[in-house]
UniProtKB/Swiss-Prot annotation:
GO terms for molecular function: cholesterol binding; cholesterol transfer activity; phosphatidylcholine binding; phospholipid transporter activity; triglyceride binding. One of its GO terms (cellular component) is high-density lipoprotein particle. Disulfide bonds join C160-C201. Residues 1-17 form the signal peptide. This is Cholesteryl ester transfer protein. Keywords: Cholesterol metabolism, Disulfide bond, Glycoprotein, Lipid metabolism, Lipid transport, Secreted, Signal, Steroid metabolism, Sterol metabolism, Transport. The keyword Acyltransferase does not apply. It catalyses: cholesteryl (9Z-octadecenoate)(in) = cholesteryl (9Z-octadecenoate)(out); 1,2,3-tri-(9Z-octadecenoyl)-glycerol(in) = 1,2,3-tri-(9Z-octadecenoyl)-glycerol(out); cholesteryl (9Z,12Z)-octadecadienoate(in) = cholesteryl (9Z,12Z)-octadecadienoate(out). Belongs to the BPI/LBP/Plunc superfamily. BPI/LBP family. Involved in the transfer of neutral lipids, including cholesteryl ester and triglyceride, among lipoprotein particles. Allows the net movement of cholesteryl ester from high density lipoproteins/HDL to triglyceride-rich very low density lipoproteins/VLDL, and the equimolar transport of triglyceride from VLDL to HDL. Regulates the reverse cholesterol transport, by which excess cholesterol is removed from peripheral tissues and returned to the liver for elimination.
């Protein structure tokens, strides 16, 4: 159950404002469907086993008057789990209510020490201490609600029940029934059932909230990088339907702890389906804010030394007219470097044909001066509008250029400028600059995503789709074993 609900939260995870609004306003929306829950349910046994093992089982003590034996006292001590196996489990989504998980035919073996004694009618005092095993077969029903507490997502399982089909007491490893075994089985069975139910259900709630914090921290880390963070607070409580779980997030970017709060766009549930396991909806406002944060952080700049520039030109098979290049660098013995940067922040919008990036671009040719300082010999600025489509395959991000427009704006050192130089620079940006920037972005973004552990997920047939005003990710996935392993290790 925890593997279902809480690993779902690893995908949905966030802090929340606990709003009771019925509106659908968000910058980011996440939908995880019933098919995904069935995959996550595969490893329910490991988390349930952890709950049983972590539960603290109190000593069970009591006494009872028995015919012939007199007053019998008993105590079960050091109760622990020695084995647990689950035959099957099912998960259901109850609309507007809960995530329900049924576990059938779980085999659980408890072990510990039994102390007992009695004073018989003939003055006999008998005290014994023996090791025991309790062999049980149970069904477990857990109905989990997603709630908010102190600004965080919390899970609550008020409906947690355990049904015992078998409860056998074995003393010192013996399997043949005896009067002692029969006596204490009858005495302690009811008490033991109540204690186990209370402790196991309590531990399930404890672990669920530990895991909620774990996955929310992990989710926040995945979408943060240095001074750039994303506010993924919920704009309303999570939605549960018969076919999916859905959460709605602000998606405001935070740069150096300063957040720009913008009006949230409207989201329509009909924009997402339920045939894939996982959906993410991003408004173009989120992508535009990302471009702004990257610009503020100085990430939109490229510096190439002379040797690097030559390698880049060769990579893209650029063979410019040899008479033009000397004209650009007239008066300087050897070029220092070329710098490409955005003087103002880019803007991003989403259209059916792709993500549209509009940005002013400045190219500066820098050459060493006689006094050892760099000197700008030529500056070329233009406005570029590029339409890009993206795909993700074999754990790598790929960008493809669908369309572009270039509008020259200004050049410096006009005495050295000419129409041929402008044509050369425009040609170089078209055939080298844009492809090189996109290639470097592919590598940088893939490296960033993998540094956050994205490559550890088994992502199946992902699709990146753009529509007017938003970008949509939809995919299937295999069970995120690494998340479960990390979480279970964190409990130790």
């Amino acid at each position: 159950m925890l593997a279902v609900t809480l690993l779902s939260l690893a995908l949905l995870g966030s802090t929340c404002a606990c709003s009771t609004s019925t509106s659908y306003e968000a910058g980011i929306v996440c939908r995880i469907t019933k098919a995904a829950l069935l995959v996550l349910n595969q490893e329910t046994a490991k988390v349930i086993q952890t709950a049983f093992q972590r539960a603290s089982y109190p000593d069970i003590k009591g006494e009872r008057s028995m015919m012939l034996l007199g007053r019998v006292t008993y105590g079960l001590h050091n109760i622990q789990i020695s084995h647990l196996s689950i035959a099957s489990s099912q998960v259901e989504l109850v609309e507007a209510k809960s995530v329900d998980v049924s576990i059938q035919n779980a085999s659980v073996i408890f072990k510990g020490t039994l102390n007992y004694g009695y004073k018989g009618a003939w003055g006999l005092n008998i005290e014994q201490s023996v090791d025991f095993e309790i062999e049980s077969a149970i069904d477990l029903q857990i109905n989990t609600k997603l709630t908010c507490d102190s600004g965080h997502v919390r899970t609550d399982a008020p409906d947690c029940s355990i049904s015992f089909h078998k409860l056998l007491l074995h003393l010192q490893g013996e399997r043949e029934p005896g009067w002692t075994k029969q006596l204490f089985t009858n005495i302690i069975s009811f008490t033991l059932k109540m204690v186990l139910k209370g402790q196991v259900c309590k531990e399930i709630n404890v672990i669920s909230n530990i895991m909620a914090d774990f996955v929310q921290t992990r989710a926040a880390n995945i979408i943060s990088d240095r001074d750039i963070e994303v506010d993924i607070s919920l704009t309303r409580s999570p939605i549960i339907t018969a076919t999916y779980l859905e959460s709605h997030h602000k998606g405001h970017f935070i740069y150096k702890n300063i957040s720009e709060v913008l009006p949230l766009p409207a989201f329509s549930p009909t924009l997402l389906g339920d045939t894939r396991m996982l959906y993410f909806w991003f408004s173009e406002q989120v992508l535009d804010s990302l471009a702004k944060a990257a610009f503020q952080d100085g990430r939109l700049q490229l510096n190439l030394a002379e040797t690097e520039l030559k390698v880049v030109l060769e990579t893209w098979h650029f063979n410019p007219n040899q008479e033009i290049i000397p004209e650009v660098i007239t008066g300087f013995p050897s070029p220092g470097q070329v710098t490409v940067h955005c003087p103002r922040r880019p803007t991003i919008s989403c259209q059916n044909k792709g993500v549209v990036v509009s940005s002013p671009v400045v190219m500066e040719f820098l050459f060493p001066h006689k006094d050892g300082q760099d000197s700008v010999t030529h500056t070329f600025e233009e406005d570029i509008v590029a339409t890009i489509q993206a795909s993700y395959s074999k754990k790598k991000l790929f960008l493809s250029l669908v369309d572009f427009q270039i509008k020259p704006k200004t050049t410096s050192n006009m005495a050295e400028s000419s129409e041929s130089i402008q044509n050369f620079l425009q040609l170089m940006i078209t055939t080298v600059g844009i492809p090189e920037i996109m290639s470097r972005l592919e590598v940088a973004l893939t490296t960033l995503m993998n540094s956050k552990g994205l490559d550890l997920f088994d992502i199946i047939n992902p699709e990146i789709i753009t529509r007017d005003g938003f970008l949509l990710l939809q995919m299937d996935f295999g069970f995120p074993e690494h998340l479960l392993v990390d979480f279970l290790q964190s409990l130790n």
